Amino acid sequence: MALVPCQVLRMAILLSYCSILCNYKAIEMPSHQTYGGSWKFLTFIDLVIQAVFFGICVLTDLSSLLTRGSGNQEQERQLKKLISLRDWMLAVLAFPVGVFVVAVFWIIYAYDREMIYPKLLDNFIPGWLNHGMHTTVLPFILIEMRTSHHQYPSRSSGLTAICTFSVGYILWVCWVHHVTGMWVYPFLEHIGPGARIIFFGSTTILMNFLYLLGEVLNNYIWDTQKSMEEEKEKPKLE
């Protein structure tokens, strides 16, 4: 038996994301007042994705509780749709985008923090909030993947969706630069056009890789779980 029910964990994670978003939006930073506001940053978009995803998880839990034993076929159909949406969102957005934000942020930060998160931001963003945006995303999504089985979409549709998201965000970053004359991320100012194309192409490939990683990890976790349950059943059968 789990020490903490997964439903309680999801609710706690959802509340933590709501707190992080509220605290982040309350910060008065110059970048929030410029074109695109917070929506030009992938970190903020990811926070919204995670909050919406865990909101759907909590809604699914509540719906499952309310429909349990009711025998109402229409309610069961709606619950299945909600579960399908939850699974799709984890596969296509919550896992790949969340892992991408954590990995890329800390890799660039370790190399040269001024390229991704200038020291000036320490005057606006407290350390706990920075970790809430760029660190805890990973363990939270792994907890969700471990506590609930998620049905991935077909590989072609999943990869198409993550490619669409990646290209859409890249075009959005380029549009912000076109309008303001400034790149969203400082390191893009220091590389040439060719290097930017390579970087954008590499990030799209990385997003696809993370989608596949999530699929493999999900299958591994639940295939292992199934094998363990079958092993436990053997003595009973004997």
From Swiss-Prot:
Transmembrane segments: 13-30, 45-67, 88-110, 125-144, 157-179, 194-216
Function of the protein: Hydrolyzes bioactive fatty-acid esters of hydroxy-fatty acids (FAHFAs), but not other major classes of lipids. Show a preference for FAHFAs with branching distal from the carboxylate head group of the lipids.
Known tissue expression: Highly expressed in heart, ovary, testis, liver, and kidney, at lower levels in spleen, prostate, brain, skeletal muscle, pancreas, small intestine and colon, and undetected in peripheral blood leukocytes, thymus, lung and placenta. AIG1 expression is higher in hair follicles from males than from females.
Alphabetically ordered keywords of this record: Cell membrane, Hydrolase, Lipid metabolism, Membrane, Transmembrane, Transmembrane helix
Induction entry: By dihydrotestosterone (DHT).
Site (Important for catalytic activity): 43, 134
Similarity comment: family membership: Belongs to the AIG1 family.
Entries under InterPro entries matching the protein: ADTRP_AIG1
Pfam families: Far-17a_AIG1
Membrane topology: Multi-pass membrane protein
Location in or out of the cell: Cell membrane
Predominant place of localization: membrane
One GO CC term on file: membrane
Extracellular face of the membrane: 31-44, 111-124, 180-193
Reaction equation(s) it catalyzes: 9-hexadecanoyloxy-octadecanoate + H2O = 9-hydroxy-octadecanoate + hexadecanoate + H(+); 12-hexadecanoyloxy-octadecanoate + H2O = 12-hydroxyoctadecanoate + hexadecanoate + H(+); 9-(9Z-hexadecenoyloxy)-octadecanoate + H2O = (9Z)-hexadecenoate + 9-hydroxy-octadecanoate + H(+); 12-(9Z-hexadecenoyloxy)-octadecanoate + H2O = 12-hydroxyoctadecanoate + (9Z)-hexadecenoate + H(+)
Cytoplasmic topological domain: 1-12, 68-87, 145-156, 217-238
Listed EC numbers: 3.1.-.-
One biological process term in Gene Ontology: long-chain fatty acid catabolic process
Cysteine disulfide links: none
Activation and inhibition: Inhibited by N-hydroxyhydantoin carbamate JJH260 and beta-lactone KC01.
Protein encoded by which gene: AIG1
Gene Ontology MF, one: hydrolase activity
Broad class of enzyme this protein falls into: hydrolase
Protein's name in the database: Androgen-induced gene 1 protein
